[in-house]
Amino acid sequence: MSRYRGPRFKKIRRLGALPGLTSKRPRSGSDLRNQSRSGKRSQYRIRLEEKQKLRFHYGLTERQLLRYVRIAGKAKGSTGQVLLQLLEMRLDNILFRLGMASTIPGARQLVNHRHILVNGRLVDIPSYRCKPGDFVTTREKERSRALIQNHMNSSPNEELPKHLTLYSLQYKGLVNQIIDSKWIGLKINELLVVEYYSRQT
């Protein structure tokens, strides 16, 4: 299944706020009205919707998300927590959380168009896994810096998660540590996502 490129508001009206996909928010109470019209949701649908929230927020294909779930399942610790950490440490998401891009698709475009360096080296793979100690910077080109500056000017002044530090004047961000689950930028029940995939196998 390919990456979603359709109407974004349609998705947030059904699934709730997806800040990685769009800065728009569903109207207050719209979720409740949708639920009341559709009646009681089945457990399968609840798990499916949590999975879809994760997929659309991070801008993943179905195959990509399944691969991350399998990697998380083989790691030590809670599969759900490891899954979120893997997704949060993607380069496109790090740029988004730093405020260098207004959405994750926007961050992915910056990476694909070769505007971004990690530790001084050009990286054009949005799924590149960042690690503690990594410096994420913009190329020293006028166009690259203008794009980042535009995003930072338009980004809401939200509190930066503790695992990141932004040096805005230098167009640079630092990954301090692996993210703690309480700083995940999405309201999600990751256990339902893991359950969804465990029941598919």
Curated annotation (Swiss-Prot):
<dbReference type="InterPro" id="IPR036986">
    <property type="entry name" value="S4_RNA-bd_sf"/>
</dbReference>
<keyword id="KW-0689">Ribosomal protein</keyword>
<keyword id="KW-0934">Plastid</keyword>
<dbReference type="Pfam" id="PF00163">
    <property type="entry name" value="Ribosomal_S4"/>
</dbReference>
<comment type="subunit">
    <text>Part of the 30S ribosomal subunit. Contacts protein S5. The interaction surface between S4 and S5 is involved in control of translational fidelity.</text>
</comment>
<feature type="region of interest" description="Disordered">
    <location>
        <begin position="15"/>
        <end position="43"/>
    </location>
</feature>
<comment type="function">
    <text>One of the primary rRNA binding proteins, it binds directly to 16S rRNA where it nucleates assembly of the body of the 30S subunit.</text>
</comment>
<dbReference type="InterPro" id="IPR002942">
    <property type="entry name" value="S4_RNA-bd"/>
</dbReference>
<dbReference type="GO" id="GO:0019843">
    <property type="term" value="F:rRNA binding"/>
</dbReference>
<keyword id="KW-0150">Chloroplast</keyword>
<dbReference type="InterPro" id="IPR018079">
    <property type="entry name" value="Ribosomal_uS4_CS"/>
</dbReference>
<keyword id="KW-0687">Ribonucleoprotein</keyword>
<keyword id="KW-0699">rRNA-binding</keyword>
<dbReference type="GO" id="GO:0006412">
    <property type="term" value="P:translation"/>
</dbReference>
<dbReference type="Pfam" id="PF01479">
    <property type="entry name" value="S4"/>
</dbReference>
<dbReference type="InterPro" id="IPR005709">
    <property type="entry name" value="Ribosomal_uS4_bac-type"/>
</dbReference>
<comment type="function">
    <text>With S5 and S12 plays an important role in translational accuracy.</text>
</comment>
<dbReference type="GO" id="GO:0015935">
    <property type="term" value="C:small ribosomal subunit"/>
</dbReference>
<dbReference type="GO" id="GO:0003735">
    <property type="term" value="F:structural constituent of ribosome"/>
</dbReference>
<dbReference type="GO" id="GO:0009507">
    <property type="term" value="C:chloroplast"/>
</dbReference>
<dbReference type="InterPro" id="IPR022801">
    <property type="entry name" value="Ribosomal_uS4"/>
</dbReference>
<keyword id="KW-0694">RNA-binding</keyword>
<comment type="similarity">
    <text>Belongs to the universal ribosomal protein uS4 family.</text>
</comment>
<dbReference type="GO" id="GO:0042274">
    <property type="term" value="P:ribosomal small subunit biogenesis"/>
</dbReference>
<protein>
    <recommendedName>
        <fullName>Small ribosomal subunit protein uS4c</fullName>
    </recommendedName>
</protein>
<dbReference type="InterPro" id="IPR001912">
    <property type="entry name" value="Ribosomal_uS4_N"/>
</dbReference>
<feature type="domain" description="S4 RNA-binding">
    <location>
        <begin position="89"/>
        <end position="150"/>
    </location>
</feature>
